[in-house]
């Protein structure tokens, strides 16, 4: 990797710290405000330079579309964080939610996994996602119809199959005993925390 300027190193550290503290990268406006830039455009130019040097990937179309391309040595050593119970209103990757780390290669999944989520309940059993399994999740704020997502509805985090129709989102279970969760985007809060990219049987890691 080409060496970074002091300002680029400062921005990269800010991005890493924001992801560590909140589970998501900062917006351009947040970077500009924290580092004293006059506009978000100045932050964007530095982000482009970091992308050219291979430190980050810029994902178009979203205000937080920044992805680190190189894992820190500590992260490689620790492995993927396992997320247990998620407290209402807290970022899913907040440190207090991490039960432990598993030495799983993120690249064994496509796209690569960013964290593991302990499955609770049997609402997705018909596609082999069972109680106690570890769901490999790729962080993403966007989803296409038919994808299995980790979604936050108001303060509840759930794993369901995503379907959007107009101004409504339906979160479908893969178990006929459960009705779809209907979310009216005009009146309810919904965010996508990530996409399911694989399942690890809990018994495989005892």
Curated annotation (Swiss-Prot):
Coiled coil: none annotated. Its EC number is 3.4.21.88. NCBIfam families: lexA. This is LexA repressor. One of its GO terms (molecular function) is DNA binding. The active site is at residues 123, 160. The gene is lexA. GO terms for biological process: DNA repair; DNA replication; negative regulation of DNA-templated transcription; proteolysis; SOS response. PANTHER family: LEXA REPRESSOR, LEXA REPRESSOR-RELATED.
């Amino acid at each position: 990797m080409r060496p970074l300027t002091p300002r680029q190193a400062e921005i990269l550290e800010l991005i890493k710290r924001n992801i560590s503290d909140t589970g998501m990268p900062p917006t351009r406006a947040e970077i500009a405000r924290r580092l004293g830039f006059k506009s978000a455009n100045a932050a964007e130019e530095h982000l482009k330079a970091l992308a050219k040097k291979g430190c980050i990937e810029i994902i178009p179309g979203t205000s937080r579309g920044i992805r680190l391309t190189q894992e820190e040595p500590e992260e490689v050593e620790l492995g993927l964080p396992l997320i247990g119970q998620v407290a209402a209103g807290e970022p899913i990757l907040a440190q207090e939610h991490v039960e432990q780390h598993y030495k799983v290669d993120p690249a064994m999944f496509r796209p690569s996994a960013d964290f593991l989520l302990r499955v609770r309940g049997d609402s997705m059993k018909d596609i082999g996602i069972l109680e106690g399994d570890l769901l490999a999740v790729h962080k993403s704020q966007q989803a296409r119809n038919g994808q299995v997502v980790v979604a936050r509805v108001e303060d509840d985090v759930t794993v369901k199959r995503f379907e959007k129709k107009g101004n409504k989102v339906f979160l479908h279970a893969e178990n006929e005993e459960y009705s779809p969760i209907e979310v009216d985007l005009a009146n309810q809060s919904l965010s996508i925390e990530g996409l399911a990219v694989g399942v690890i049987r809990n018994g495989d890691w005892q």
